[in-house]
UniProtKB/Swiss-Prot annotation:
Binding site for substrate: 64, 85-88, 205
Disulfide bonds: none
Entry protein name: 3'(2'),5'-bisphosphate nucleotidase CysQ
Residue sites binding Mg(2+) 1 per the record: 64, 83, 85
InterPro entries named among the record's database cross-references: CysQ, CysQ/Inositol_MonoPase, Inositol_monoP_metal-BS, Inositol_monophosphatase-like, Inositol_monophosphatase_CS
Its EC number(s): 3.1.3.7
Length: 246
């Protein structure tokens, strides 16, 4: 199934790139929470929804762009969790740091994940406890790697005072910034060793990256030390977390 999901992510990426390269208008509007949504978000959502319904018609789908109500999903044990375009702000900035995220959740855990960066044409994927990176047609296993001083990857769009204080107390380290779920992937492939995030995050923003990082050997825990959980609940928010090799 993983190969089919990867192809689906590529197809969604192709739809996004038609907007990114100017073939189709971007049409930026604001959602109720003031976050931006574009024609690319909607196009990718449509591709993924149609594809998953064909691939696995018995597994329900929760997508950021059309999340079903609590009464519909409260008893779900196995479901797809999708962010058709993670990093819409990066997309609008045209810096290439956005991804297509597709995860399969089973009893609260992401057991399969795909993170595809269309501009970079890089695919990260995970299933059955293994993680891969595919670039330039070459697919290889990836795993976490220690480094001293550690490289801490942080959000390009969500820096805050709490993060600044945390980094001041961390000890010797280096930092880099990147958008979207690529932060999870940098830890997964050994380029970074730590990704701290403070404040709540929507579940579709983390599930696919969580799957990739965990399969590569990283720990994805909240600040109380508990693994991030995707068991259906009324809120779509997970607490702050850290992705770490330690």
């Amino acid at each position: 199934m993983l190969d089919q999901v990867c192809q689906l992510a590529r197809n969604a990426g192709d739809a996004i790139m038609q907007v990114y390269d100017g073939t189709k208008p971007m049409d930026v509007v604001s959602k109720a929470d003031n976050s931006p949504v574009t024609a690319a978000d909607i196009a990718a959502h449509t591709v993924i929804m149609d594809g998953l319904r064909t691939l696995a018609p018995d597994i329900p789908v929760l997508s950021e762009e059309d999340p079903p109500g609590w009464e519909v999903r409260q008893h779900w044990q196995r479901y797809w969790l999708v962010d058709p375009l993670d990093g819409t702000k990066e997309f609008i900035k045209r810096n290439g740091e956005f991804t297509v995220n597709i995860a399969l959740i089973d009893h609260g855990k992401p057991i399969l994940g795909v993170v595809y960066a269309p501009v970079m044409n890089v695919m990260y994927s995970a299933a059955e406890g293994k993680a891969w990176k595919e670039e330039c047609g070459v697919r290889k296993l990836i795993q976490v790697r220690d480094a001293r001083p550690p490289l801490v990857v942080i959000s390009r769009s969500h820096a805050d005072a709490e993060l600044k204080e945390y980094l001041q107390q961390l000890g010797e380290h280096q930092t880099t910034s990147i958008g979207s779920s690529l932060k999870f992937c940098l830890v997964a492939e050994g380029q970074a060793q730590l990704y701290p995030r403070f404040g709540p995050t929507n579940i579709w923003d983390t599930a696919a990256g969580h799957a990739v990082a965990a399969a590569a050997g990283a720990h994805v825990h909240d600040w109380q030390g508990k693994p991030l959980d995707y068991t259906p609940r009324e809120s779509f928010l997970n607490p702050g977390f850290r992705v770490s090799i330690y």
